[in-house]
Amino acid sequence: MKEKEFQSKPLLTKREREVFELLVQDKTTKEIASELFISEKTVRNHISNAMQKLGVKGRSQAVVELLRMGELEL
């Protein structure tokens, strides 16, 4: 088997990761939406989807968990 077949799928989508990278820079939902050229609702959806994947109930918990897992850096 090829090495690529053994690589696990990333936990976050590319866009979810972009949102959280901006979130840890202390950007607001509005600022993130503006920077990524998406709506504030879409930003909230990306955050919510990531929170569901992580099994956490808040943005702060999601950030802490992503940092702990090495999925996000400060």
Curated annotation (Swiss-Prot):
SMART domains: HTH_LUXR (SM00421). Residues 29-48 bind DNA. GO terms for biological process: regulation of DNA-templated transcription. SUPFAM superfamilies: C-terminal effector domain of the bipartite response regulators (SSF46894). InterPro entries: Sig_transdc_resp-reg_C-effctor, Tscrpt_reg_LuxR_C, WH-like_DNA-bd_sf. The keyword Transcription applies. Involved in the regulation of spore formation. Directs the transcription of several genes that encode structural components of the protein coat that encases the mature spore (CotB, CotC, CotG, CotS, CotV, CotW, CotX, CotY and CotZ). Also controls the cgeAB and cgeCDE operons. This is Spore germination protein GerE. The gene is gerE.
